[in-house]
Each structure stands twice: as structure tokens, then as C-alpha cells.
């Protein structure tokens, strides 16, 4: 585990794209924002991620428990692929516009289940039972659009992180 910061506001565990892929996603989001005439602010490349678990604005003991659970996880690296965009339902005027896909996402779901079991052993409750639709949020907009195919974007998930890189754990079998 590698610690990079100390803030615990809005903690979550996530898979993140590499820097080149994040920049590609950001550029795609900018083009789609123009094409769909969205008004929202695009998520910056260093904040793009696939959320695995949201932990809330947690105090340090919760962060420590999450770190202990994450350190127990063993899983090989895998590829994810996103090939379409869509708007999710959200609060009026604040609808998430996201990347969706299928390829590799079963392995991501498996990683999430494994992490959920480890977190349950540390005292977290019911995390793995919640619905999970793997996605990358590009921006939040006032209106929504239907599903739209895109040139596939893929990357190899080599690690998962706590909040925007508070801590990280490499994937290894």
C-alpha cells in the first residue's frame, strides 16, 4: 500500500485509468459535451475513475479499516472496455453523463465482490449487496441523452485506489 495524502472527505475505493487513457477520456468528454450541447463541467483527467465502494466522509478509523481490507485483496490485472455513453437518472439539473461497457466488467465485478468480502470481515456491512453498474462519469448536465456508441476506450486495471489516490493497492494474483 502506498499513501499519498491525508484527507478523508468523501472517501471511496475506485479503479482509475492510466494517465494517457484519462486524457483520451477527457478529450472525448469535451467533444461529446459540444455535440450534445451540455452545460456541465467535464471531470478533470486526474479525477476520472470507476467507483467500487463509496465510504462517505469518513473519520480516520474508517479509512484505516478500509485500507486493512484492501490490503487483503488478491486479484490479477484485467482489461476493461467502454463502448458507449448514456445519461443516468439524477437530480434535475445534475444528471451524470457516463461511459458504459461490457468487456472486462465481469472481472471488475469480481474484484468488487472480493473487496466487499474483505471489507465485511473488517466490519463494513452490506457493501457488496448494493447494485453495481460499472461506469466512468464524464460530467453532470441539466438534461439527459440516450445511449450513444463511441469508439471503444480500454485500459488495463492494475490497481485500485482509496479516494483520489490516498492509498493504492496493486493487483496481483
Residue ranges and their predicted role:
Residues 1-173:
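Histidine-dependent nucleotide/RNA phosphoesterase domain, centered on the 2H-phosphoesterase fold
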Amino acid at each position: 500500500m502506498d499513501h499519498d495524502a491525508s484527507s478523508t472527505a468523501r472517501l471511496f475505493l475506485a479503479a482509475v485509468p492510466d494517465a494517457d487513457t484519462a486524457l483520451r477520456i477527457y478529450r472525448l468528454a469535451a467533444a461529446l459535451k459540444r455535440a450534445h450541447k451540455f452545460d456541465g463541467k467535464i471531470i478533470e483527467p486526474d479525477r476520472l475513475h470507476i467507483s467500487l465502494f463509496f465510504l462517505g466522509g469518513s473519520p480516520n478509523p474508517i479509512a484505516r479499516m478500509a485500507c486493512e481490507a484492501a490490503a487483503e485483496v488478491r486479484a490479477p490485472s484485467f482489461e476493461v472496455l467502454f463502448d458507449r455513453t448514456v445519461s443516468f437518472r439524477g437530480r434535475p439539473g445534475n444528471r451524470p453523463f457516463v461511459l458504459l461497457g461490457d468487456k472486462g466488467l465481469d472481472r471488475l465485478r469480481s474484484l468488487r465482490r472480493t473487496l466487499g468480502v474483505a471489507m465485511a470481515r473488517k466490519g463494513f456491512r452490506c457493501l457488496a449487496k448494493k447494485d453495481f453498474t460499472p461506469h466512468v462519469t464524464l460530467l453532470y448536465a441539466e438534461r439527459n441523452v440516450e445511449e450513444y456508441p463511441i469508439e471503444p476506450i480500454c485500459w488495463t486495471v492494475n490497481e485500485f485506489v482509496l479516494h483520489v489516490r490516498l492509498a493504492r493497492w496493486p493487483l496481483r494474483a
